[in-house]
A protein has these predicted regions:
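Ligand-binding loop in jelly-roll beta-barrel domains
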Residues: 86, 144-146, 153-157, 166-190
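Conserved short histidine dyad/triad with adjacent acidic residue
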Residues: 44-45, 89-132, 165-168, 187-189
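Double-stranded beta-helix
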Residues: 27-32, 36-41, 112-119, 174-191
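Bacterial N-terminal signal peptides
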Residues: 7-17
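A short beta-strand-loop-beta hairpin characteristic of the jelly-roll/cupin
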Residues: 124-126, 130-132, 137-158
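N-terminal secretory signal peptides
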Residues: 24-64
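Boundary at the C-terminal end of the N-terminal hydrophobic targeting segment
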Residues: 19-21
Length: 191
């Protein structure tokens, strides 16, 4: 059966049951006029009051997703979404040992991502720097971490939300505890 969806909206909605949590930090990345990754928005989003306080953090205009009620889509062997697809994953970033960091291949992440990585915005600033052809919704579940962009570093911690719009970035944990992040990756056209 074929289903047509017109004007569909995909919204990331964060619901919070705690009456004391009134806002959430949201960081949205974008490309500037020189193709550099920047933090376009970095501020607080206030939860709408109600029985289940919530805040709409980002909206895109389309995402027809096929439904599968039998296959385990989480068993697929890739972290990146397929063409026109999505991927949901949790990543735990251990603290980065400075000695190991110094020995890293400058194109470490680009080699891992391979052909799916856009070629604009190179060379990379750090071995962990990468860029995928996706919009990524990220929620820091625990710990804290630095998000390196082309010309800045944004420090995020548990409870912060990031929207990556196919920009160069690296996740660098310079702390002493692991940082766990939930990612929803959505395939997008080449920026």
């Amino acid at each position: 059966m074929t289903s047509k969806i017109f004007g569909s909206i995909v919204a990331l909605v964060l619901a919070c049951s705690s009456a004391t949590a009134t806002d959430i930090r949201r960081v949205v990345t974008a490309l500037d006029g020189n193709d550099k990754a920047i933090a376009l928005f970095d501020g607080r989003v206030t939860l709408e009051p109600g029985a289940t306080p919530s805040a709409k953090l980002w909206v895109t205009e389309a995402a027809p997703a096929p439904l599968s009620f039998t296959d385990d889509s989480g068993a697929k062997p890739t972290a990146l979404p397929p063409d026109l697809g999505t991927a949901l994953l949790v990543v735990e970033f251990p603290p980065l040992d400075p000695a190991e960091e110094a020995k890293m291949d400058p194109n470490f992440m680009m080699k891992i991502i391979g052909e799916r990585a856009p070629r604009r915005g190179l060379p990379v600033r750090h071995p962990l720097m990468h860029r995928t052809r996706t919009v990524d919704y990220a929620v820091v579940l625990s710990g804290e971490i630095d998000m390196m962009l082309d010309d800045s570093v944004v420090h995020v911690r548990a409870g912060d939300v990031i929207v990556q719009q196919a920009t160069n970035h690296a996740w660098i944990n310079r702390g002493t505890q692991p940082c766990r992040i939930l990612f929803a990756l959505i395939d997008s056209p080449q920026p």
